[in-house]
Amino acid sequence: MDLTVSDRGMWNMTGDSEVTSLEHSRGGVINMNASPAYETLHSGSYTGNGRIFLMKTDLDSEKDGDKVTIDSAADDFSGLIMVKDSSLYTGKEVKGIRNLLLVTGASGKARFEGKDLDQGGLWDVTPVIKRGNEALDAEGNAVGDHTEWYLTKVEKKVNKDTIPLIKAPDNSYALYRLDIDSLRKRMGDFRFRNLKDTSGIWARDFHGSYDGQGINSKYNGFQLGYDNAANDKSVDGFFAERNISSPKYSYGSSENHGLSAGVYGTWFGDSGVYTNVVAKWGRDDMELKSWSNYPDRADYRTHNESLSVEFGKTFTKDNGLFLEPEAQMVFGYLGSKNYTTCRGKTVHMGGYDSAIGRLGILFGKRVTEGEHPYNYYLKFSVLHEFGGSRSFHLAALDGETMDYSEDYQDTWEEAGFGGSWHFGGNTSLYADVERSFGGNWNKKWQWNIGVNWQF
């Protein structure tokens, strides 16, 4: 039987096949992956260029896989081999020296090389193909001769449409840690209130931008809260927060809408000591899109919670200068989630226990004379994430799987400046600007502005 496969046409083999003459050219595909069983193809003569073989392999076994035998080939014969290796489905990484015979060309004129394969699963796979006299075993000996072609390695990388699925949880974590507040950032200088034992309401707006780990995003948020002053040394209250971010990934993007609520208590000592405790619960709604060869999308919701404990002491001089060392621990939990994309990819992200410590110092000055007292300061902090890794499992409809973990342990620094201004009655305005350095996610800038009304 004579057969022609050309002009991007495809021959779906469903069993062992033998042809007398095979013309294979101009992007034609011989698909040996149409059947789950390993198959053999025997061709008497072979002509053409630009042809593609799609073959099933089990490189780790060094024996199981589709086989092609060619008795004679034209002098200019060359072929491209794409593989679907069993390691794509088992999640097992093929290690060490491996050689799997795929093609035998008796004339020795045929030439083959690997071609990358992405069929919309999880992986982009490029096989390394070598002649038998160039493929070596563990002792350095050739495993075949120049008429044979061996698969020696399967190079896998995450395909373009899977990258956003991996990066989206990283963005959620980055937003969680960027949202960590200190007392002064959230409320300004609490001791700058006009009436120390009077309740009030406050509002704060913040905007920022960050990048890192393949993510670039702008974000903004708004907080509204109520203070209940039990006396001139203690204040408790509650607040609500709404935040939005628009991260960009390689070959994708998302829209994140967060909603959270919290309660807090703050206590002041006679010697400038303060303690601030904040408990917070939130959710994050994700609208995720990819836009490469196999565009995909997913919508899902995650939850998080945190408990922050902050201590500080203000040392004040007669000329208004002050120094304020601070220590803070934030314990948090980012919830687990299972979801399925529009193309049927399933994603499981495990929960994550976070523990972020911060050591900081402020240096500033208070000016208390006049109708509108104010203060200003410089600040610097070192932060460290003590939490470990977060686990993930992905699976595609074609059977490809992926298991990995993301280690969020990190150390970084933050620096900024800010101040408070009492501008009349029982109203105070406060603001600051900051950025971070040295971490996996860099806060390029963030500014905060807030106002406190007492009544």
Task: Describe these PLM feature segments.
Residues 155-323, 432-434, 439, 452:
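Outer membrane beta-barrel translocator domains of Type V secretion systems
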Residues 68, 216-222, 255-259, 301-307, ...:
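Residues that define the transmembrane beta-barrel architecture of outer-membrane proteins
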Residues 90-109, 217-233, 337, 346-354:
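Short secondary-structure subsegments characteristic of cysteine-rich extracellular domains
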Residues 1-72, 76-78, 88-152:
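Extracellular beta-solenoid/beta-roll
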Residues 246, 250-253, 284-301, 333-354, ...:
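Solvent-exposed, glycine/polar-rich loop segments of beta-barrel outer-membrane systems
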Residues 73-74, 102, 203, 325, ...:
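Residue-level detector of buried hydrophobic side-chain packing
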Residues 348-455:
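Outer membrane beta-barrel transmembrane domains
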Residues 321-332:
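Internal active-site segments that recognize and position negatively charged phosphoryl groups
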